[in-house]
Structures are given as C-alpha cells and as structure tokens.
Curated annotation (Swiss-Prot):
This is Malate/(S)-sulfolactate dehydrogenase. The gene is mdh. Acts on oxaloacetate, sulfopyruvate but not on pyruvate. Has a higher selectivity for the coenzyme NADH than for NADPH. Its main location: cytoplasm. It comes from Methanothermus fervidus (strain ATCC 43054 / DSM 2088 / JCM 10308 / V24 S). Its EC number is 1.1.1.310, 1.1.1.37, 1.1.1.82.
Length: 339
C-alpha cells in the first residue's frame, strides 16, 4: 500500500493526540518519522511507530511533561528527558545546541532518560539548516558483540553528520554496526532474509535469518575500525551524558522497559572560523572534485536526496503487516482512516 507523506503525518498526529500527546509534541514526532521514510530509512519511520504507541500505553513513554536542564554552561548542557517521546527531547536538545553555537561557536547537549528518537540525521539536519555542522550520536540496547566476543554488549550506536552547502545535501546517517537493528526488525516483519556476513546467531554461527540475528549478535561494520567507533560512541552517548551503557541500556527496542540510553547532540558554527558563504563554496568545490572522478560517483547524502524526491512524488510504501497494525491501532482509538 502507498500513502502520501501528508497522510502519514496526519495519521501519526491523530494517533498521538488520541493518546494524550500535545499538538506540538505530536507534530515534532511526526516530522521525524516522515523524514525517515522519505529518506529511505523505513526501519526507523512509521514501521517503528507501533513501538512508541505501545510504550505510551505501558507508561514507559510519558505523554506530557517538560525536559529538565540539569547542568548548563555557555556551550554545554545536560538534559533529563523525563521519558518523553525521544523525538521531542532530541529536537529540543538540538535547538538548544544551535542557540549555544550561535553565541560561542559550539553547542554540545547531552541527554539521558529519553526514548528512541528515530533517525539521528534529522537532528544533524536541524543544525545544517541553520548554516551549522550538526553531529548526533546515540547508544542502544546491546546488539553487537565486541570483536572476538560472542555476547552483545554494544549498541548499534549510530552517528549522523550534516554539513551546510549551497548546492548539495552533504550528510551521513549510519549505524556503526553492519546493519541497524531496525533493519532486522523490518526484515523479520516482512519474512525476508538478511544479507550474509552481517550477523551471527546465539551460538556465533553466521545467519541470514533476522530472528536468529536478533537473538544473536550483529557484527560491527568494517571489522576492528567499526568496532572501535561503536565502542567510542557507547561512551560518548553513555557515561558522558549520565546515561547507561553496555548491558545496562534498555528500552530502545523493548517498550515494556524504561529507556536508559543516551544522546549527544553537537552544533558547530563555521562562521566563527571564517565567512560562512566562503565555507559553503569550499564544500561545494570539494564535492565537485569528488564527483569529477567518475560518472556515477555519489557523496554521502545523495541517496537520501534522491529518495526524498522520489517519495514526495510517488508516496511511501507500507507493507501489509504494518498496514494491519496501523489499522488496529486506529480502530482502538476510534480514528477513521482516510486511506
């Protein structure tokens, strides 16, 4: 089934409103979810939405309240998200980081006691749209075993970086595991196999079964280099921001548990180094040089840009099981679907 971005956004807002979420918070959450689907990160789009609905019903995600700034300097802040929707907390966290960067050149905001926030790239893009460099990191429930180990104690730990440019969308949003766990959940829902070489079962044997992988371990991307980056993000989005880490991280997949992961949001103002327009021209020049080396050379962000253009025109495809689940949620809340 195919729906328009507007239909998806409207449904999410209606459901969240019916569950007691304010219009402001519902719109923020819907924007992040639709952005994920438009960019092609369908494992973190509306396919993940039923998890949030379940968390709200169970009380692990709070529908109302405010974030609390626990500690603050001119360039740094630590936020307690008070278990609100993760999209809302991260959005407000990056807004604060951007404001700090306007004054000092850099804003760094750490978050704990929040929830799964969807795609990391949305928040980095917020900085980019303000002519700043945005960097977002988060940790997750354990899914990745250390190199040489068999027991998952690391999250998939994504990192996203967005850079302002006049002519291009320059951005990367990636898991530091060989695959995001959301991709495994999506493959399991669709009864699809996963590629070889990205996961092992609970006995350490290679598997293409997403369910065995979910009960086993995802491999780090890029061998020891990916493992090292995953390890470092666990610290930057865990101990640094007063959040849990390793086997103590809960609630990013299982909505029955209070979420204990952390986020680190960074905004850097290039204009504090030199003229912002000159910086963006230099970025454009570099991209042109990269693209001049071959006919089909892509830069980080090209695939997302092409996906957005395609899906804004053609719509967002939903699989049968997801449609059934969304209809079930809507029926429970007496919401009439328009599609």
């Amino acid at each position: 089934m195919i729906i328009s971005p507007e239909e998806e956004r409207s449904l999410i807002i209606k459901i969240l409103n019916a569950l007691g979420v304010s219009e402001e918070h519902a719109k923020i959450t819907a924007d992040v979810i639709v952005d994920a689907d438009l960019k092609g990160f369908t494992s973190h789009g509306i396919g993940r939405f039923p998890q949030y609905v379940e968390g709200i019903k169970l009380g692990t995600i709070k529908t109302s309240g405010n974030i609390e700034i626990e500690k603050e300097t001119d360039s740094v802040a630590l936020i307690n998200g008070n278990h609100l929707l993760g999209q809302v907390v991260a959005y407000k966290g990056m807004k604060l980081a951007i404001e700090k960067a306007k004054n000092t050149g850099v804003g760094i905001v750490g978050i704990h006691d929040s929830n799964h926030f969807g795609i990391a790239g949305y928040y980095s893009d917020m900085a980019m749209k303000n002519d700043m460099i945005g960097i977002t990191m988060t940790n997750t429930e354990p899914a990745v075993a250390p190199l040489g180990g068999k027991i998952p104690v690391l999250g998939t730990n994504p990192i996203a970086i967005s850079i302002p440019s006049n002519e291009y969308y320059v951005a990367v949003d990636m898991s530091t595991a060989a695959v995001a766990r959301g991709k495994l959940l999506e493959a399991a829902r669709k009864n699809e196999k996963i590629p070889e070489g990205i996961a092992v079962d609970k006995n350490g044997n290679p598997t293409t079964d997403p369910n065995e992988a979910l009960n086993g371990s995802i491999l780090p991307f890029g061998g020891h280099k990916g493992y090292a980056l995953c390890f470092m993000i666990e610290i930057l989005a865990g101990p640094l921001v007063k959040a849990e880490f390793g086997s103590k991280v809960k609630g990013t997949v299982d909505p029955s548990q209070m979420c204990t992961k952390g986020d680190l949001l960074i905004a850097i103002d290039p204009s504090k180094f030199y003229d912002i327009e000159e910086f963006k021209r230099n970025v454009d020049e570099f991209v042109k040089e990269i693209k001049s080396t071959g006919k089909d050379v892509l830069i980080p962000g090209d695939r997302e840009r092409m996906n957005i253009k395609k899906r804004e025109k053609e719509g967002i495809e939903l699989d049968k099981k997801l449609v059934e689940k969304l209809k079930e949620i809507a029926d429970e809340l007496n919401i009439e679907l328009t599609w």
